[in-house]
């Protein structure tokens, strides 16, 4: 799949789930389940409830995503 096929959206982490999964509320109000990208896992980026994140979704399943960036601050 080409990189252009992904949908990038901003959201807020509202819940932490087991196995580095998170429940994220997107800007449009939808709630998705997201996991951490491999690069964030490798660099030990910590994600807590309330953090602002960027989530990458595929057009095939809009209920699951990948957290690709945690905003500073």
Curated annotation (Swiss-Prot):
The keyword RNA-binding appears for this protein: yes
Subcellular compartments: Cytoplasm
Gene3D superfamilies: Nucleic acid-binding proteins
Residues in S1-like domain copies: 1-72
CDD domains according to UniProt: S1_IF1
Keyword entries, A-Z: Cytoplasm, Initiation factor, Protein biosynthesis, RNA-binding, rRNA-binding
Its biological purpose: One of the essential components for the initiation of protein synthesis. Stabilizes the binding of IF-2 and IF-3 on the 30S subunit to which N-formylmethionyl-tRNA(fMet) subsequently binds. Helps modulate mRNA selection, yielding the 30S pre-initiation complex (PIC). Upon addition of the 50S ribosomal subunit IF-1, IF-2 and IF-3 are released leaving the mature 70S translation initiation complex.
Family: Belongs to the IF-1 family.
Protein name as catalogued: Translation initiation factor IF-1
Species, as recorded: Legionella pneumophila subsp. pneumophila (strain Philadelphia 1 / ATCC 33152 / DSM 7513)
